[in-house]
Amino acid sequence: MVAFRMMSMALLVVVASSWWASPVEAASSPRVDHRLVRRSLFDPSCTGVFDRELLGRLNRVCDDCYNVFREPKVATECRSHCFLNPAFIQCLEYIIPEVLHEEYQANVQLVGK
């Protein structure tokens, strides 16, 4: 029982020390570029308003469409040209209720200017 507690404490110390790394160590870690990586997930052809929430909603349509059809080209074609393509329109018609289509198409125009 004592050995188990000692092992648990040692594991806790290792996890805590890696979690609270010093700023010097954090600067050299790959997590520093996290914002750049997240931003680069979106199509660089989207030259309009950069709104994470809006782009996330549009990406979600493509993700859901991919989950339905399970074809890799669906995901890539849906996002191409900043969502301004026939694949996105087809996914929109299949995934989103018709009353919201105009809202989503307006969002595409907003991010893709």
UniProtKB/Swiss-Prot annotation:
Modified residues (Valine amide): V111
Gene3D superfamilies for the chain: Crustacean CHH/MIH/GIH neurohormone (1.10.2010.10)
UniProt superkingdom: Eukaryota
Cellular component annotations (GO), alphabetically ordered: extracellular region
Signal peptide: 1-26
Main location, first listed in the record: secreted
Tissue-by-tissue expression: Expressed at a constant level in the eyestalks of juveniles and mature females. A low level expression is seen in the central nervous system.
Cellular localization per UniProt: Secreted
GO biological process, one term: neuropeptide signaling pathway
Disulfide bonds: C46-C82, C62-C78, C65-C91
A Gene Ontology molecular function term of the record: neuropeptide hormone activity
Keyword terms, alphabetized: Amidation, Carbohydrate metabolism, Cleavage on pair of basic residues, Disulfide bond, Glucose metabolism, Hormone, Neuropeptide, Secreted, Signal
Segments passing through the bilayer: none
InterPro entries attached to this UniProt entry: Crust_neurhormone_CS, Crust_neurohorm, Crust_neurohorm_sf, Hyperglycemic, Hyperglycemic1
Family affiliation: Belongs to the arthropod CHH/MIH/GIH/VIH hormone family.
PANTHER family found in the cross-reference section: ION TRANSPORT PEPTIDE, ISOFORM C
Function comment: Hormone found in the sinus gland of isopods and decapods which controls the blood sugar level. Has a secretagogue action over the amylase released from the midgut gland. May act as a stress hormone and may be involved in the control of molting and reproduction.
Protein name, entry field: Crustacean hyperglycemic hormones B
Lineage, top ranks: Eukaryota, Metazoa, Ecdysozoa, Arthropoda, Crustacea
